[in-house]
Amino acid sequence: MKPIAGPGGILVVVGMTREAKILGPEAPVLIGGGDAAALATALEAELAAGVAGVVSFGLCGALDSSLKVGDLVIGEVVLDGIDRLPTDPAWTERLAAALPGARRGGFASSGRPVASVADKAALLAATGALAVDMESHLVARLARAHRAPFAVVRGVSDGARRALPHAAQVGLAADGRPAIGPVLASLRSNPFQIGALIRTALEAEDGFQALERARRALGHRLAGPGRVDALVDHLAADPAAIVSADHALGEAQPTVLQDTRGPPLARPGA
């Protein structure tokens, strides 16, 4: 399958189609949905093809009680088990400069929704992270393996002291679209959660609005590195490539432009 980002492109990883729509049609986006294995496979292929950077973008749950619904959080480090995976420092600084009201800190990883207040408190105690989401650890782990810069920008949709009802936990399909059937089935089994579900949806809207503000402030590349930045990072990571790059640049400056249809064409002004 042809890469959607390609060399020089900024790849965005989200969990839901709603998050992808905020980015607009020009953004190369992978939608994780509830299928972590499929997301990892697709992300691995994109990174192997080469990208300028990858960013985890979408909603998150607060672990720190000082975070409010609708706050933006910029990741400085992703905590994946015992691993601490720092985001790209320069990219993180650009994000912070463009989003002056955003909080900065760590993101915890989870392969499932962290729904109860007790679970959020336990994860905070174990990691010290500000927030949690379900995609950033995959982005961080695979980006590091491919020496690609990565960043995290997320909007808070549920507070540290807010529990998610069961209907909200089953509301995401594997393709990132709303899973209406499981939500209705959950409501039939426990109709008393309807109030909590409505509240969860309203608070999620605050998170989506925060993401829309971030998208407008950051532009379609989400403040990511450009082609030149990516080349510099690549050469810094692999000094031996400098010789190859210098050789390639030298060969790319001929004194004569060769026309394959006839004799050489002199360079204008020669």
Tell where the protein language model's regions lie, with residue ranges.
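Glycine-rich phosphate- or other oxyanion-binding loops that anchor nucleotides, phosphorylated ligands
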Residues: P7-A270
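Short boundary motifs at domain starts and secondary-structure transition points
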Residues: M1-A5
